[in-house]
Every structure is written in structure tokens, then in C-alpha cells.
Amino acid sequence: MRYTIFILSLLFPFLSIVAQPKHEVRAAWVTAVYGLDWPRTRATTPQTIRKQKEELIDILDKLKAANFNTILFQTRTRGDVLYPSAIEPFNSILTGKTGGNPGYDPLAFAVEECHKRGMECHAWMVTIPLGNKKHVASLGSQSVTKRMKEICVPYKREYFLNPGHPATKEYLMKLVREVVSGYDVDGVHFDYLRYPENAPLFPDKYDFRRYNKGRTLDQWRRDNISEIVRYIYKGVKAMKPWVKVSTCPVGKYRDTSRYPSRGWNAFFTVYQDPQGWMGEGIMDQIYPMMYFQGNNFYPFALDWQEQSNGRQVIPGLGIYFLHPDEGKWTRDEIDRQMNFIRKQKMAGEGHYRVKYLMENTQGIYDELSENFYAYPALQPPMPWLDNVPPTAPSALKVTHIDNGYTELTWQAATDNDQRNKPMYVIYASNDCLLYTSPS
């Protein structure tokens, strides 16, 4: 097969910034597992509860100052959660003890604080992995491996939900239902919605014999993951049609005509079919984990966009590789990738992880806040969910008050409901306003 090699020097002879769009997803993953991003303090007293909350507020304030607009807040890790659940226990990272009540609801707090800052909050849920044997043992009788053994599989010193068991999708939907019905989240974001690495050895022969219905093992496994996606997507839309459903698949879908995936891809290696999900209309956004450089990034990012069926493609960028302990990337690599994303008119990008933004690793935060995200951006519209604009407000009144401040008041329309809830954007300029400009 012939492949096209992407010559970056031709694509970007210099690292000028592509014009900022008015609509763009600017997302960051807030990782709770092991306290990688948050929290650093255990909530065991009124003082430490306040400190834990302040740590999250500091993150949100800094991201807001850089004009981020989407927070992917880790809500489920591996068989445990960061909200009071009737199904799974609290993650130990909150208090130092599995199941320990932190004295507040972290997910509700995150949603409220994001909305105060005009940012969306998406509940990031790890789906199939349940953790290693030590972690599962720490959950005791609260672990799903004890309560629903039939849907759990031990494999390579870890436990996983079994995608081939019909009850697995029901179990995951119960968790999703708790979150979507109980919280004003703007989206649910699914991680590890796939088979594990080295999946050909996954111990599901019994289920395959029972449920395959004439399909090959590869097709059956791929259909299992797609059926989970389909079931959850329809369930979310039945509850709250405006809640966005997204996932972060493996960064390479499969070999492309431009470049090979070199054996690691979503479709064949871990049985994900995200392009099929977008084509079927059962996924609103994908955040492919594009933690690659050069020809391992650009051809595959473009492939996602070309096969998106109009759904939103938001490449996840591996900014953690800017740290010398993680990789040897220079910031120019991230700059080129962000410029490419804009030039190809993708919906935006996500940054993994928040820690490296907070620490301004290689000046990445300064570059975003001062240049690339210098102006705020609105969320890209999703016309397949709702193409009816909210009714405009009325009775706009401008009042000049003390110290050079101006107060705006208006009467909100009464025919807008939760399905069509407006967010107001205020433009200000000393010159003639240009509404299409992000500045």
C-alpha cells in the first residue's frame, strides 16, 4: 500500500497562530485517580474539606482565566466514584478511606463551580476496567466483583467488566442514570470503553459461544462495545436530550490511505468502532487520544475529521509529554498540532492533563492564555440535538453607574425550557461591533 507522508515544514513553515474561531471546545481533563490532578488534600475535617474544595476552585479559576470552556471532571475511576452513589463506593482519594464520605458532594460542587464560571462540566467515567486485585480487595463487599460476579472478568492481574455479558450495559447505564438524572451535567464522557490491551487473550470464550449468533470473535466483540454505546446514548437522550455524550477512543482508528497505524488502533486492537458510532449518530463528540507526534498524529487526526459524519472531533493532546519525566517533546510540537486542528476546522482540543497547565510546563499555559486562547470561545452548536434558537430576551436596559461601570438588565423569554436553555453572550467594544469575531 502507498502512503502519503505529511511534511510539516510545508504545512506550517512558521508557527503563526491560525485565526481564533468564535466557536471552539477548549477542554481539560481533571484527573482524580491517585490524586494526579486533584485532590491533594484528604477531606477529614471541616478545614480539610474547605481546603479540598479550594484546590478545585484554584484549578477552575486558572482555566477560566485562560478561556477554557469545558471541564472533563473524573467522576468514576475503577469501580468507585466521586459522588454519593447507591451503587458504588466513594473513591479513597477523597478521604484516604474507601467509601469514606468527604462531607460534601464533589460532583455537585464541580458542576456548580464550573457553571459559575460559564464553563461546561462533563462527568468523565472510566467504564470497563475495575482495577488490580489490590484495589478490588480494598472495596470489599461494595465492589461490583462481589455483588455481580457474573459480569466481571479477571485478566492479567486486573478485573474488568465483561462487554460480552448482556447485563454489563445495564450496570453501566445505572451509573450513568444516577449522574444524568441527579446532576446538571452538560455531558457524560466515557473512557476505556473498549477491550483491554492484548484483547485476543481476553477470557470470554463461554460468552462468545453463547451469544455470538454466527459472528466472528472480532465482530462480536466490536458489536458488544457498540451495543453498550448505543444503549447508553439512547438512555441519556431519553432522560435529557441536551446532555452531550462523548468518549475518548484510542488515537488511531485503523490504517489510513496516508499512513499505517503500526499495529495499535481502535478498530482491530481493542474493538472500538468510533467512526461507526458517529456514522450511526450514537455519539455527539469524540476526544481521540492523539498522544503522538508527526506522521503518527496528523494523518489520523485528519481521518477522524473526514469520517465524523458532522459530529464533533476534539483531539486529545498529550501535553504531559512536555515534562522531562514523561517525554522529550518541545512546545512547538503542541503548537503545530493546535494550529493543524484549527486549520482543519475541527471542533477544538482537549488537554491531558491539568497538572501541566497549572505548572505552566514549557510555558504551555502562558501560550494558551496570552495567544491561542486570548479571547473566549462559545461551544460549537450541535444541530442534530436542537436547531431551534432560544427566543431572544426583551426590555434591554443600559444604565451607566459609578466608576465607569455599565449595568445591563433584560427580561428573559418565558418559552425557553431546560431543553432550550439560553446562555447570554455580551459583546462590548469602543468601535463598531463585529459579532463574528472572537475578539
Which residues does each predicted region cover?
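Catalytic domains of carbohydrate-active enzymes, especially glycoside hydrolases
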Residues: 54-79
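Active-site-adjacent "subsite" loops/lids of carbohydrate-active enzymes
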Residues: 35-50, 128-178
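Aromatic- and acidic-residue-enriched segments that line the glycan-binding/catalytic groove
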Residues: 83-95, 129-155, 193-212, 260-263
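Solvent-exposed loop/turn segments flanking beta-strands in beta-repeat/beta-sandwich domains
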Residues: 415-431
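Active-site neighborhood of glycoside hydrolase catalytic domains
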Residues: 182, 187, 196-249, 253-259, ...
